[in-house]
Amino acid sequence: MKFTKRLTDAFNEQIKAEMWSANLYSSMAIYFQSMGLAGCAHWMKKQAEEELEHANKLIEFGVTRGGEMKISPIDAVPGTWAEPKAVFEHVYKHECHVSELIDNLMDVAIAENDKATQEFLRWFVNEQVEEEENAQAILDKF
């Protein structure tokens, strides 16, 4: 089954969101580096790399399914926070938002009756559960 236009558009929006997330985490890494918090900066860099991996997974799957995948311009990300805890609060809220986006993408796959895409997206659903848990666990330490 070839990707429908609706699925192609939804995947392209998610790719854009994943790339924005990578930029957000890179910005957070810079913030922590400037504060001398190397461990936090390292964690954020790893998160940024992971977001790019997510974008690439979406691109590869979309291309395989005949979708016209593209890289869209992304908006600027924040660069300052009041304190380190505020950064991790932002991380948690952002990961909850990404979970909603993935759920919406799954809804499109269900509406388009594309079972292969639903199966593919289950990995992302499970990944978001882990991402929210990790962010909450860090916040709980503050």
What spans do the regions from the language model cover?
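Iron-associated oxidoreductase/ferritin-like identity signal
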Residues: 1-142
